Design a protein with these regions (language model features):
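Juxta-kinase regulatory segment immediately upstream of eukaryotic protein kinase catalytic domains
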Residues: 20-53
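All-alpha amphipathic helical-bundle segments outside canonical DNA-binding/catalytic cores
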Residues: 188, 318-329
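Conserved small/polar residues in nucleotide/adenosyl-binding loops
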Residues: 341-348
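Active-site Asp-x-Gly
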Residues: 233-234, 240, 247-306, 312, ...
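Membrane-proximal basic amphipathic "stem/tether" segments
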Residues: 2-24, 33-35
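Hydrophobic alpha-helical segments that form the core
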Residues: 327-338
Length: 348
């Protein structure tokens, strides 16, 4: 998908992306808890015990990845869990920081979509650890991080299978019967594209530090070129490699999909557009490959066009205006980069 509009993004995003070291193709291991993000161990142990969860000799560590909600590893003498809570000091617990909403998505989706972790408990008492939280299954496996080098990557055939599984899983998610999943109240498809475009433009205007004519042009273009809405589906809104947990014994299989905080009812093609925005091709401009946000240039990966064709083939749907969805995905990712750049802390 060679779109002249995308050229306007490259110089912009390269100003804001801050490259950090992330794990290569390895187990996503928890680390020591970051200073200032410790949990009240005694209160948590008592609460878990009162809710029939064994908490003797409870060990707590923290998963280092992620820029929104905080994720902890809990291990007792007999069990392992993952705890999710909002960042410390966050002003609003709505939207992506709403723990009950995220818990409810996973709980209800599990019966229709096997690739979500089980959830065990939700707590709305902020007196326990300072904020609402929930416990979910710890899914062990491998995660393909953005800076994975070719020399460390799985075989070409495995990457081919994983990329196909990514698209198949996205189509499977989009085909879920919303009513059977009891998620009718998750969002509203009516006006979804308009709300998304206006919402991300608003976030950009609140976070920009310079006058960027290219971004302003793209914002206007998105407003003027919105396609007709299609039938709504459950959308993930951040569907990419490093939100997939691969089977630890067979790396070509997806065991679980993580980070559901932005899930809603929306246009499935907008969800695909975000995935395409993350998808960097080998023949893309060097500027884009510098801040690659997903390991999509490894041998075995299809191109963006290949991902689009595979989605159409597996879904049986023809996407009339793929350029719009791709440009929206790029704009959204650019705004996220801008938000991270202007935030006092990556976790605010």
């Amino acid at each position: 998908m060679r779109v002249p509009l995308k050229l306007k993004f490259y110089n912009f995003i390269s100003k804001f992306i801050q490259q950090g070291k992330t794990p290569n193709f390895s187990m996503d291991a928890p680390k020591r808890i970051r200073k200032g993000e410790e949990l009240a161990l005694d209160k948590l142990k008592k609460y878990l015990s009162n809710n029939n969860i064994e908490a003797n000799e409870l060990l707590i560590k923290q998963f280092p990845s992620g820029y929104s909600n905080l994720t902890y590893f809990l291990k007792s003498s007999t069990q392992e869990f993952v705890l999710r809570r909002p960042p410390f000091g966050v002003k609003s617990l709505q939207g992506g920081h709403d723990m009950f909403r995220e818990y409810n998505v996973l709980k209800n989706l599990k019966s229709q979509f096997a690739k979500v972790p089980d959830v065990y408990l939700y707590c709305d008492d902020s007196e326990i650890i300072g904020a609402p939280f929930y416990l979910m299954e710890r899914v062990e496996g491998y995660i393909i991080r953005p800076n994975l080098q070719q020399k460390d990557a799985p075989k070409k055939e495995i990457i081919q299978n994983v990329s196909k599984s990514l698209v198949s899983s996205l189509v499977e998610l989009h085909n879920i019967n919303i009513e059977q999943a009891n998620l009718n109240d998750l969002g509203n498809i009516n006006g979804y594209i308009k709300r998304q475009v206006e919402g991300w433009i608003k976030r950009y205007n609140h976070s920009k530090t310079d006058s960027l004519q290219n971004m302003d042009f793209i914002a206007s273009w998105l407003i003027e070129n919105q396609p007709l809405e299609v039938k709504g589906s459950i959308v993930h809104n951040d569907f990419k490699y490093d939100n997939l947990v691969l089977n630890k014994d067979d790396h070509s299989k997806i065991t679980a999909i993580l980070d559901w905080e932005m899930a809603t009812i929306g246009d499935p093609f907008m969800d695909l557009g975000t995935s395409l925005g993350y998808w960097v091709d080998k023949n893309d401009l060097p500027e884009l490959k510098l801040f690659q946000l997903s390991a999509t240039t490894l041998d075995g990966n299809p191109t963006r066009e290949g991902i689009l064709e595979l989605y159409e083939q597996k879904s049986g749907k023809s996407i009339i205006n793929p350029v719009f969805y791709y440009v929206f995905g790029l704009f959204k990712i650019a705004v996220i980069a801008c938000l991270l750049y202007t935030s006092p802390s990556p976790r605010d």
